[in-house]
Design a protein with these regions (language model features):
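Extracellular N-terminal segment of 7TM GPCRs
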Residues: 1-41
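Loop architecture of class A 7-transmembrane GPCRs
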Residues: 2-11, 83-107, 129, 140, ...
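Cytoplasm-facing ends of alpha-helical transmembrane segments in multi-pass membrane proteins
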Residues: 32-44, 70-77, 106-130, 144, ...
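Hydrophobic alpha-helical segments of membrane proteins
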Residues: 36, 67-78, 153-156, 160, ...
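Seventh transmembrane helix
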Residues: 198, 245-246, 252-256, 273-317
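Intrinsically disordered regulatory tails of 7TM GPCRs
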Residues: 1-11, 49, 211-235, 296-317
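Extracellular TM2-ECL1-early TM3 structural module of rhodopsin-like
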Residues: 16-25, 54-118, 126-129, 133
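Intracellular effector-coupling site of seven-transmembrane GPCRs
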Residues: 56-65, 207-251
Length: 317
């Protein structure tokens, strides 16, 4: 009886860990399916629409980042929550996978963040210079390339510093504490600076939309349609920013607490780390829902793709 009672809490913790991992993996699977759908919708639109606009390409870029993020973190959810981070594959092959895994984990989040900033810059150009095409298709592809290159350069030192660390019989893929603190602080700075830039850009966009004067040769109907489209996109992008930072804030709080040496305050809160991970994973689920809610054309195209028909109207114009 004594042995049974001693093993009961262990069994309960194991069951709880499996339940948490299952929930996280389910959320990531939904995120994967939704973002694949987004890419398919935009691909159909890109092939058939005469307006291959930058918004659609940037949204597709966010979805691609979310797809990679989901694929990478589905096994991670089980590894972190059930195996306590124990890295099963070791040796030279395991070491290479460890370095690649940590490298990709940094890239996907920063890429999504920089792409949202790129959309803000694009919308600023559209609103302030409606008759000039400043961001061409070629420029757009170059910006997308930069949204992957900049995070890759930031994460490049991981290939050197990532290694196996053994503690209490568990081998994890990680960085030394001091290196981790530097990366966490750098990541926080990137998110803060991009947020600050987006706030300035969208404040300027909102001010311009509020006091905009259209040329006399634009009809009332065309003016109303343009205003409505700009307002819808403006609201959608603001919601994207709020969702990204709301979902990232808990994990960012954990990382900063570690970098600033008060991590113990949060580590003692039993479920905080799980909630932080779940919130982070939910962002990939929320983004496609935002596209559907705020964009009628995208909503229509989703229905047509699901019914195996083609969408021929421009999305995110």
């Amino acid at each position: 009886m004594e042995n049974a009672s001693d093993s009961s809490p262990v069994h309960e913790r194991k069951t709880e860990a499996i339940a948490k991992a299952t929930l996280c993996m389910s959320v990531l699977a939904v995120s994967l399916l939704e973002n694949v759908m987004v890419v398919l919708v935009l691909k159909k639109n890109f092939r058939r629409s005469p307006m291959r606009n930058a918004n659609s390409l940037f949204i597709a870029n966010i979805s691609v980042a979310d797809i990679f993020f989901a694929i990478q973190n589905i096994p991670h959810a089980y590894n972190n929550l059930v195996l306590n981070g124990h890295w099963i594959l070791q040796g030279n092959f395991g070491t290479v996978l460890c370095k690649i895994d940590m490298f990709l984990s940094v890239i996907t989040m920063v890429t999504a963040n920089l792409t949202i900033l790129a959309i803000a810059i694009y919308r600023l150009c559209v609103v302030f210079f409606p008759l000039r095409k400043i961001i061409t298709r070629k420029t757009c592809f170059f910006i997308i390339f930069l949204t992957w290159l900049v995070p890759a350069l930031f994460a490049l030192p991981i290939f050197y510093f990532a290694k196996f660390i053994s503690n209490e019989g568990i081998t994890i893929c990680s960085l030394k504490d001091q290196v981790r603190k530097i990366f966490y602080a750098g990541f926080a700075v990137i998110l803060f600076m991009t947020l600050l830039a987006m706030l300035v850009l969208y404040a300027a966009i909102g001010f311009k939309l509020w006091r905009r004067n259209f040329p006399n040769n634009i009809s009332e109907r065309a003016r109303a349609l343009r205003e409505k489209r700009n307002r819808e996109i403006f609201k959608m992008l603001i919601t994207l920013i709020v969702a990204f930072y709301a979902c990232s804030l808990p994990i960012l709080t954990l990382q900063l607490s570690f970098a600033l040496d008060f991590y113990v305050v949060y580590s003692e809160t039993r479920h905080f780390r799980f909630i932080a991970l779940l919130m982070l994973f939910l962002n990939g689920v929320i983004n496609p829902i935002i596209y559907i809610v705020f964009n009628r054309s995208f909503r229509s195209c989703v229905k047509e793709v699901l019914s195996k028909r083609y969408c021929c109207q421009p999305v995110f114009a």
